[in-house]
Amino acid sequence: ENFWSKLGSKTKFMTFNDHDYVLSLTSHLPHVVAYSIVKTAINNEDKFKDDVIQYSAGGLRDFTRIAASDPIMWRDIFIDNSKNIISVLDKFSENLKDFRKAIAEKNGDKLIKFFESTKNVRKEIVKAKQEVNLPDFGRKKN
């Protein structure tokens, strides 16, 4: 702990199980989603492959950055933390089904609620100084 504190890190003690579950949500699930989205984009009809690359918007580019991670490392993480990742994937699948249903039903109110709840999470991340665009994660005190 002293080592990390001297480097400017904040430390928190948690059990191995809690660590693995939290990381399955905050790191492993986003990687699964990124790999799936990029695979979906490139496995579209071949006639659109060049267009997908040429017109890739910020969202797809963000996912390709994540999906370009070391395959061997992520294979090992997915295997080692499979129990938690599968549990989180099941929850994600339910949310995705709800999202799909709202789109299919053209339920604008439900979509707005979904968007607003996730937008609030972003605000909380910024408030907690977890903005990763900065080299010090926004923690440096001026």
Where do the model's predicted regions map?
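Internal alpha-helical scaffold of NAD(P)-dependent oxidoreductase catalytic cores
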Residues: 1-64
